[in-house]
Amino acid sequence: MKHVLTLLALASVFAVSNQALAYDGQNCKEPGNCWENKPGYPEKIAGSKYDPKHDPVELNKQEESIKAMDARNAKRIANAKSSGNFVFDVK
């Protein structure tokens, strides 16, 4: 009787664990595309309360800083080629 109860308990644990492994909590539209919006989240973001409404000036700050960084790096490389040693702070 003890063996039967043990086997029954193991079988039930195995059955429950297989069901738990099979369900991942997502409804995928296709493999790799499993994002689901939360209830109440709009299909279209523009014009909703979730729209970030970025300022174009703020968006261009990163582009300007990257251009300035590239210009500084070009000066450093030109100085390194002409002098033979690398100097970080080149005016």
UniProtKB/Swiss-Prot annotation:
Role, per record: Catalyzes the oxidation of primary alcohols including methanol.
Catalytic activity field: 2 Fe(III)-[cytochrome cL] + a primary alcohol = 2 Fe(II)-[cytochrome cL] + an aldehyde + 2 H(+)
Protein location: Cell inner membrane
Enzyme class of the recorded protein, top EC level: oxidoreductase
Gene Ontology MF, one: alcohol dehydrogenase (cytochrome c(L)) activity
Disulfide topology: 28-34
Family indicated by similarity: Belongs to the methanol dehydrogenase subunit 2 family.
Record's keyword annotation contains GTP-binding: no
Domain of life, per lineage: Bacteria
The name this protein goes by in its record: Methanol dehydrogenase [cytochrome c] subunit 2
Predominant place of localization: membrane
Keyword Cell membrane among record annotations: yes
Signal peptide start and end residues: 1-22
EC nos: 1.1.2.7
Alphabetically ordered keywords of this record: Cell inner membrane, Cell membrane, Disulfide bond, Membrane, Methanol utilization, Oxidoreductase, Signal
Oligomer status and interactors: Heterotetramer composed of 2 alpha and 2 beta subunits.
Gene3D superfamilies on file: Methanol dehydrogenase, beta subunit
InterPro entries, A to Z: Meth_DH_bsu (IPR003420), Meth_DH_bsu_sf (IPR036557)
Pfam families: MDH
Cellular component, GO annotation: plasma membrane
Single Gene Ontology BP annotation: methanol oxidation
